Amino acid sequence: MKLSKTCLSLFAALAGSLSGAQALAHDMVPGKAAEGPLLLTGLTIHTVTDGVKTDSDILIVDGKIAAVGQNLSAPQDATVLALDGKHLYPGLIALANQLGLIEIEAVRSTDDSREVTQTNPDIKAKVGYNADSEVIPTIRSNGFAYSMIYPDGSMLMGQSSLMQLDAWNYQDAVVTDGTGLHVRWPNASTLGSRWNPKPADEVRKANAEQLAKLQQYFQAAKAYYDAEQAGLNRGIDSRWHEMLAVFKGERPLFVHADDERQIRQAMLLAKEYNLKLTIVGGRDSWRLADELAAAKVAVIYTAP
């Protein structure tokens, strides 16, 4: 049987695509859930708030810690594992990152981290999460069990999600669907970039326009919230509807900002709408540490 050059090309392309897909996937199989209670004995347990407990046991029921102590009694149907001398640490949570959303930064087809417009408060990071990312095993080997991922972009970027890192797909991985709304705060510096140098007046004007636009978005979202509370909304606007939980105080507002002026502007907006504010980045947060503490504003420090 003879194969045409076209067929051979198609086979080669298919083989290449399959090998490429395999190269972007890890071979770790998610652990099987324990059948019934699980008792681990003889451990050195490093707790979050109660120091280190030696020669201790831990009882896990329905995937959650039910008891910690010495000489715990095993339920009748429990599996008992003697782990004498082993150390047990709580899993770490990686905050405000894009694990599973970006595989190779230089390859656009592996980047599912952002949308193209400025108003995406209804975008959820979980949908773009790749549970088969090659990066995940490395992160897990360093003690991380969870990751709070967020969609990138400008202004209203979208909703972050808390994911557990031992999963087949994003549906299995989701722990908390919406952990908060992420906003990239407009530039406050009057210096142009070296790639796009502009006079200070032009930069200042552009900054003011972007800040005014962001304030308009929040005004529209607050108007939608007020109408919702009064039962006057006649339809659903998915953008502002997803922000209802932020105005209700059920979810925090994560503002990505480094400059002191940006942080102050974000604090004013949070105070105006009575929002739970968390600063992400926070390079200059040390300059107003007392004010942040007084306003109960949390900081996820990621700035170099």
Give the location of each predicted region.
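Bacterial N-terminal signal peptides that target proteins for export
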Residues: 1-10
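N-terminal signal peptide c-region/cleavage motif recognized by signal peptidases
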Residues: 16-20
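Short N-terminal segments immediately surrounding and downstream of signal-peptide cleavage
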Residues: 23-44
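Histidine-rich, glycine-flanked metal-binding segment
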Residues: 30-32, 45, 49-89
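Metal-associated gating/positioning segment near the N- to mid-region
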Residues: 86-142, 147-150
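Polyanionic/metal-chelating signatures
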Residues: 142-277
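Glycine-enriched alpha-helix->loop->beta-strand junction motifs that scaffold or abut catalytic
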Residues: 270-276, 293-300
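Short, acidic/turn-prone active-site loops that include or flank metal/cofactor-
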Residues: 282-284, 302-304
